[in-house]
Amino acid sequence: MKQPIMADGPRCKRRKQANPRRKNVVNYDNVVDTGSETDEEDKLHIAEDDGIANPLDQETSPASVPNHESSPHVSQALLPREEEEDEIREGGVEHPWHNNEILQASVDGPEEMKEDYDTMGPEATIQTAINNGTVKNANCTSDFEEYFAKRKLEERDGHAVSIEEYLQRSDTAIIYPEAPEELSRLGTPEANGQEENDLPPGTPDAFAQLLTCPYCDRGYKRLTSLKEHIKYRHEKNEENFSCPLCSYTFAYRTQLERHMVTHKPGTDQHQMLTQGAGNRKFKCTECGKAFKYKHHLKEHLRIHSGEKPYECPNCKKRFSHSGSYSSHISSKKCIGLISVNGRMRNNIKTGSSPNSVSSSPTNSAITQLRNKLENGKPLSMSEQTGLLKIKTEPLDFNDYKVLMATHGFSGTSPFMNGGLGATSPLGVHPSAQSPMQHLGVGMEAPLLGFPTMNSNLSEVQKVLQIVDNTVSRQKMDCKAEEISKLKGYHMKDPCSQPEEQGVTSPNIPPVGLPVVSHNGATKSIIDYTLEKVNEAKACLQSLTTDSRRQISNIKKEKLRTLIDLVTDDKMIENHNISTPFSCQFCKESFPGPIPLHQHERYLCKMNEEIKAVLQPHENIVPNKAGVFVDNKALLLSSVLSEKGMTSPINPYKDHMSVLKAYYAMNMEPNSDELLKISIAVGLPQEFVKEWFEQRKVYQYSNSRSPSLERSSKPLAPNSNPPTKDSLLPRSPVKPMDSITSPSIAELHNSVTNCDPPLRLTKPSHFTNIKPVEKLDHSRSNTPSPLNLSSTSSKNSHSSSYTPNSFSSEELQAEPLDLSLPKQMKEPKSIIATKNKTKASSISLDHNSVSSSSENSDEPLNLTFIKKEFSNSNNLDNKSTNPVFSMNPFSAKPLYTALPPQSAFPPATFMPPVQTSIPGLRPYPGLDQMSFLPHMAYTYPTGAATFADMQQRRKYQRKQGFQGELLDGAQDYMSGLDDMTDSDSCLSRKKIKKTESGMYACDLCDKTFQKSSSLLRHKYEHTGKRPHQCQICKKAFKHKHHLIEHSRLHSGEKPYQCDKCGKRFSHSGSYSQHMNHRYSYCKREAEEREAAEREAREKGHLEPTELLMNRAYLQSITPQGYSDSEERESMPRDGESEKEHEKEGEDGYGKLGRQDGDEEFEEEEEESENKSMDTDPETIRDEEETGDHSMDDSSEDGKMETKSDHEEDNMEDGM
């Protein structure tokens, strides 16, 4: 056994307490203090008893308040103990507690722990420290026995709860924690004791081996811990702060203040702990919580208001605090499981993302569904019914989508080999590539006549109400029929869905629950919200013969409504279906959807797509210029033709409904939302962005169409109704709504508002119609799609725009071909002759635009044949030429989605090679992307010069929206400055005010108090910069920006500081200097003194002469001299200013360096000048101009300057 270490004496003597109040403390002198290296000592447990009451507590605290700090447990016998100790003290009972010293007791070793420390027994004894078998201080032991025996009898009479009884209880004890400072001070022996106190006692004699604090009854197994506890908690002096309730002492007042919180009620503790010492000024009025910063209080108030402004773009989870949102985004746990190609990533599990169904606490039903699907078990009827109850909010749609995509419901679902007739749920055709078609999985069982159909009608109505409000809010300006077209279509496409039976039958409810729309038409929830996302390509084999007969009758009724648009042959082909799975091309029957898809997609010889692949040279028709269309134009035309593509092999048809559904909910998605949409539909993000932009333009043109109904009426009674092959690919308007909606050409003509009403001409006016072989209307790779550039950008000759050249005639005299392939038209000269108009004609002829309802084979001509005006400015150029080339600046749009307004200035403003007019970039051959930023800013249509424009304004009044903007001939033209600065024909004085007197932007919902502010704002939509620098070709939005920029090239500095004499070229730089640097800039007197000193040293220049030279050098800065290069070149000579002053030549070098420093400060001031100029792009452009706008002469000058410095350095080195 390890020999014990003898203590020299009382090691924790209370030396600084003059008059201690505590009388009942036992002291053991010369006891053994052993180490605790053994594991047996660590097995001892601490019991903290409330057996010894503190006389201080009796005097300072009410008896009804329990002393929570003295013990971690609730004491139920505090009052009887206090009374008993009062009787002992009043009775004059004295105890031999020697010299008022504290208890020192320790156990020598584990072998000598043989007696119990049973404070609860009637014969209470205490095991004293044993040293070599000798018991010291026997008198103290007997006193302890007598004291505890009497005390225990009194406690039994008071029904006190003993420690033994307390430890045997099975209920939960309430533990009041201590202040953080107390537990963290010097190892905190109390904290260790409290942790060990939570452990159950291992042996019955564990409490006999503890050392108890005589002040607060805490127990410790090591003497050092007890000493530290008494020293830091009970030892008092003048510098310590003592708790008046529990006699704890603290070295700092802040510790005492935090400790006092523990004596407060529980509701007040949190408030007092969070409030600092007067530095939390912002207090919540709801809960009283205070904050140091105001923005913390603002975020905290959202907890009470329920506001959650931050939304995750991936999982749609909302957050009230920006920190929570940021951590959620940075964790990247909600990234979707669907990759770009629509397939699941193999290395990601279903439950590893918040998009998975297990992440939502309300998705227990989906979780069960996922578990069953993972185990490969088919769903029962009741489980399929329960799927309808899973979601009540459309925002949680991603969970269900990811679940369905995870288990492959796009075609290879577990139901394929299950008990549902070997077909996918709802008969969804495996060729349907829509990534959202799995919404209808498992819904056919309760919808085939089972009584569970109406159980979820309330939830469906909630979803419909939400979607209804969203669509109505975004489409407030549209008419009722336009809103209904956006939200859902009442009739499905009969040509595209020959096997659609079972989904639209009234007896067999559609996918989802039937609901009634505003006009009484019955349609499904899925069709209502996602616009036919789940269109079925084949019907269920389990349908009965009666249901097929009823569906066939319904199909016939639907086809009668399209009698004016579809030929009789097409109708017979649509509803004469022999078997559910028959090829739509050759009518061959197949046993199931998979063989049918295989045949239609790859094997059917009647499929035009397969023909095009097998015989590409026969079907592909080159463009007018001999250039094939590019993929981007093909993709764009395929999407714009929307309902014209319904073949199962078409890769874009299934995405249109999804894209329009997203568009209905958010018309302007950000980049994150675009990425999410692109992942959902499996298309590139650039494509989705382009689609949204063009959809916006189309909706804008729809909402501003005043003659929408008028132009749509003549469509029905037509002698030559077009086939769907020629009609559908031309217009985004769906074919079944063509009776009540105009074609895209009439929409554009009605929006134009600057021309007479559309004149419909027969196709025989300018073509020889020949019967064309009937093609599949859903072809996605049409050889002649929407050609946005008139020619390919690589082979285009329109950049060198020469109206009389053969290339211009060859490329642009024909209208753009937007239809399917057709045979060659008449010669172009005939077209030019027939479209020729008389000189000075004001009304514009629309012969080149054919009605889609009257012409079945002719393309929809959306361009405009260039008109000729007999004006003196252009007669010498065009009067002798009978051939008309296409005017790229005409009033007609070059593709469907553009508003029919001219996006570029008249042709006179564009020289053949390259324009020098400010704001006009080189014309890149009608590049489709260059149109978008200029859509909203139009130049007068058809005019070639200013004189033309003024002359036309005299005779013609613009109609509608454009006329309101352009009305007023006197205000229209005030010279080239107004043409460029005021955005051409958008006269500032004629911009309409709103009802509140504000100027509203027609492209967004912003309003402005001044028309100039509105024009400045509109530059943000177009990106137009009409003012261009002639030297460096840098363009600016405003004329005064160009003026100040030109001073960088000219060296002009009209602004000068009156104190330091520094000059500035920009007003912003000057204002910045005067506001921030005027107080410490150099004084003019100092400059004069420096000049005189230089003059005295050089001897050949007078001070006034030197000042004049300096002023001259400051006023003429070399053009394009880069400040950064100046700063790099100037410090290369390691000469001091004095060395420069000694040489006459170097004096001018110093002046140049000072000038460079001034330029550097000027540029720095310009970069800081955010308040003086509201356009930060202008500041950035001007800063860049300073670095990159040097011409050749300035380059040469700069090189010469550098060489001069190098020569100076060499001379100095020698």
Curated annotation (Swiss-Prot):
Residues 702-715, 780-808, 840-854 have a biased composition (Low complexity). Residues 437-487 are annotated as: SMAD-MH2 binding domain. One of its GO terms (cellular component) is plasma membrane. The modification N6-acetyllysine is found at residue 377. Keywords: Acetylation, Chromosome, Disease variant, DNA-binding, Epilepsy, Hirschsprung disease, Homeobox, Intellectual disability, Isopeptide bond, Metal-binding, Nucleus, Phosphoprotein, Repeat, Repressor, Transcription, Transcription regulation, Ubl conjugation, Zinc, Zinc-finger. Its main location: nucleus. Residues 12-24 have a biased composition (Basic residues). Residues 1156-1167 have a biased composition (Acidic residues). There is a cross-link at residues 391, 479, 555, 611, 632, 713, 866 (Glycyl lysine isopeptide (Lys-Gly) (interchain with G-Cter in SUMO2)). The modification Phosphoserine is found at residues 142, 356, 360, 364, 647, 731, 780, 784, 1122, 1124, 1203. It is found in: Nucleus; Chromosome. Induction: Down-regulated by microRNA-221 (miR-221). One of its GO terms (biological process) is positive regulation of melanocyte differentiation. Residues 644-703 bind DNA. InterPro entries: Di19_Zn-bd (IPR008598), HD (IPR001356), Homeodomain-like_sf (IPR009057), Znf_C2H2_sf (IPR036236), Znf_C2H2_type (IPR013087), ZnF_E-box_Homeobox (IPR051574). Residues 1-101, 702-740, 771-810, 832-857, 1117-1214 are annotated as: Disordered. Sumoylation on Lys-391 and Lys-866 is promoted by the E3 SUMO-protein ligase CBX4, and impairs interaction with CTBP1 and transcription repression activity. Belongs to the delta-EF1/ZFH-1 C2H2-type zinc-finger family. Transcriptional inhibitor that binds to DNA sequence 5'-CACCT-3' in different promoters. Represses transcription of E-cadherin. Represses expression of MEOX2. This is Zinc finger E-box-binding homeobox 2. It comes from Homo sapiens. The gene is ZEB2.
